[in-house]
From Swiss-Prot:
One of its GO terms (molecular function) is oxidoreductase activity. One of its GO terms (cellular component) is plasma membrane. It holds the Pfam family Cytochrom_B_C. This is Menaquinol:cytochrome c reductase cytochrome c subunit. Residues 229-250 are annotated as: Disordered. It is a multi-pass membrane protein. SUPFAM superfamilies: a domain/subunit of cytochrome bc1 complex (Ubiquinol-cytochrome c reductase), Cytochrome c. Belongs to the cytochrome b family. Its cofactor is heme c. Component of the menaquinol:cytochrome c reductase complex. Heme c binds at residues 192, 195-196.
Length: 250
């Protein structure tokens, strides 16, 4: 019979099983390329986090968040603008194939396919290669998506009317409008309030509050028009025009 054939080693009861408690090494026993979690590693993390926190707080103090006037849901002329990380979706909804009757495609279907593909990427690309040039399909899709996001964001920034956006969101001083005044009733009768708002603070037309215009300039604009406002809208007499201009909150 060969030695060990058919035999099973079940242990030797004469050899004691020494179990030592899991005690961490002393600080002095660590080699030069390693370090203890506390205080070395964790203290460095805290210091880096503190620097970023202080920098972020200084940034918020130096550049506070821009505030606009109180939101008015009845103002149909207001053009909303999302945060910068949603600008590419905002621009996508401007195209004909993703807006109007096709809003569902631009708002749900296309982003859903993109984020769904991102979630399924680890399951679809199961190859052993990790170098980008060895994974042409995955790398190409990533670069195409990144290029589309950058282009749509840039296009949204370029085509947005920033001057109009700053003007429409400007916080204006509240001015009490006497709706019983004769000048206000004249403006209301000539449909001025339908464009400039019931409080003359702006609507489809610009605000008439705090414009700095003189009564003569207001009368001239009301008679001849200016910009997108055509002339001949005011149908009253010269006397009514003068009363309206003199009572303007400009």
């Amino acid at each position: 019979m060969h030695r060990g054939k058919g035999m099973k080693f079940v242990g030797d009861s004469r050899i004691p099983a020494v179990r030592k408690p899991n005690i961490p090494k002393d600080y002095s026993e660590y080699p030069g390329k390693t370090e203890v979690f506390w205080p070395n590693f964790l203290l460095k993390e805290w210091l880096v986090g503190s620097v970023f926190l202080v920098g972020f707080l200084c940034l918020t103090v130096a550049h506070p968040s821009p505030l606009e006037r109180i939101a008015d849901p009845t103002d149909t002329t207001y053009i909303p603008l999302p945060d910068w990380y949603f600008l590419f979706l905002y621009q996508l909804l401007k195209y004909s194939y993703a807006s109007g009757p096709y809003t569902v495609i631009g708002a749900i279907v296309m982003p859903g396919l993109a984020f769904g593909a991102l979630l399924l990427a680890p399951f679809l690309d199961r190859g052993p290669e990790r170098r980008p040039w060895k994974r042409p399909v995955a790398t190409g899709m990533m670069l195409l998506t990144l290029a589309a996001i950058v282009y749509l964001t840039w296009e949204s920034v370029v085509t947005h009317d920033w001057e109009k956006a700053a003007e429409q969101g400007k916080i204006r001083a509240e001015v009490e409008i006497d709706t019983n005044a004769e000048g206000y009733k004249i403006a209301q009768a000539n449909t001025c309030t339908s464009c400039h708002g019931e409080n003359l603070s702006g609507g489809a037309g610009p605000s008439l509050v705090g414009t700095g215009l003189t009564a003569e300039e207001i009368a001239k604009i009301a008679k001849e028009g200016q910009g997108s406002m055509p002339g001949g809208i005011f149908k009253g007499t010269d006397e009514e025009l003068q009363k309206m201009a003199n009572s303007s909150p400009a």
